From Swiss-Prot:
Taxonomy of the source species: Bacteria, Bacillati, Actinomycetota, Actinomycetes, Kitasatosporales
NCBIfam families, alphabetized: gatA
GO cellular component, one term: glutamyl-tRNA(Gln) amidotransferase complex
This protein's name: Glutamyl-tRNA(Gln) amidotransferase subunit A
Organism of this sequence: Streptomyces coelicolor (strain ATCC BAA-471 / A3(2) / M145)
Function field: Allows the formation of correctly charged Gln-tRNA(Gln) through the transamidation of misacylated Glu-tRNA(Gln) in organisms which lack glutaminyl-tRNA synthetase. The reaction takes place in the presence of glutamine and ATP through an activated gamma-phospho-Glu-tRNA(Gln).
One Pfam family from the record: Amidase
Amino acid sequence: MSDIIKLTAAEIAAKIASGELTAVQVTEAHLARIEAVDEKVHAFLHVDREGALAQARAVDEKRERGEKLGPLAGVPLALKDIFTTEGIPTTVGSKILEGWIPPYDATVTKRLKAADVVILGKTNMDEFAMGSSTENSAYGPTGNPWDLTKIPGGSGGGSSAALAAFQAPLAIGTDTGGSIRQPASVTGTVGVKPTYGGVSRYGMVAFSSSLDQGGPCARTVLDAALLHEVIAGHDPMDSTSIDAPVPAVVEAARNGSVDGMRVGVVKQFRGEGYQAGVVQRFDESVELLKSLGAEIVELDCPSFDLALSAYYLIAPSECSSNLARFDGLRYGARVGDDGTHSAEEVTSLTREAGFGPEVKRRIMLGTYALSSGYYDAYYGSAQKVRTLIKQEFERAFEQVDVIVSPTTPTTAFAIGERADDPMAMYLADLCTIPTNLAGNAAMSLPCGLAPEDNLPVGLQIIAPAMKDDRLYKVGAAVEAAFVEKWGHPLIEEAPSL
């Protein structure tokens, strides 16, 4: 394995800025890694080799001219295939958008380019971000670099797998019910769901508009903070974008501390269904926080037990509306366009061929929940539960600065193990969904390996909305303490591919 691909994003940016490395050298090293291992991992759906090298050459030329470089100049990045990229395919893991090349960049894509980040390509994902394992991709599953027979999480398993396989030091994901944090947890990486509205959704293909949020993925807390600062900020193109200063996440990541902080532990985030090794590593993390000077506060949030049920009414309802735009007439795949079918028949045939089973399941569920006579009983009730969850978070944050929990109830499960059991699959997001419903910020970072299977366990940190900096302050302190304890970052234990 090349020494270059072991570097953090912060180290790469510093070495390129000083001239110790060129952006082309760094990009070529990561492209070589992708070529060497991605046949096994399948993290990428599209590798833009020529585009990445062109971006890298532009960074090197900019430096030679003495021009100011972007904050992550020359650092390679893997982009989840849910963000539009001008001239590069965007499939959202679906056959219905196979071959679609967007005519414009998402705001996140634009901001990455403005920061001189080198986009290596687009990563695999569950179709339309609906899944917890990246098995629902129309283009095949992604393997977990720790054990290729295991899932890398979902929906953004391609992004987390690319990080764990050292194919890129940075990645972008999206989080609707845990799709950044859950993959980070099972691959031993860092993933952050910013405050809802903190990162623009313009050009991000919609699943559930009131829940979707883009965010940074990395192998270290500082790298995630550097990326967070690049992509965050108000965007007039997104009506849900928050018009407020971006929290000082990089400063927080450089000054990690929990001394004197009140840290909440929620009673509902443990019990039946939680793997013993996950609970053990979480309990050790709580003891670590105590040793670092934090005060632990027990919290009771009974409405959190209803979060999963509420989510699986709200998200499918919004998805059934959002996916109505894929009609086979305006863009993407088109089936039955031979002059013998009506427009309505073309739409029906296109959706039947283009959407996978999980997407169809959620569209039907959402349509039913919104239907006349059932709206109040299902969607309306779910929104009331959502309000209760928000209120319980608000009361909790009157007592504590942050809340911690396991990120997922179990470590990575085997590919195919839960394919025929949707409920078992949905339970993977048990700890992450409440945060999405409330719009708060959350992070997952590695807290060790489960003794039973030697697979990564994630610690989730939750902060109030627009207090994203607290995630990084706590996360950096915990990360430093664990690295000192282990003698090296957890990710260095990942088996060689």
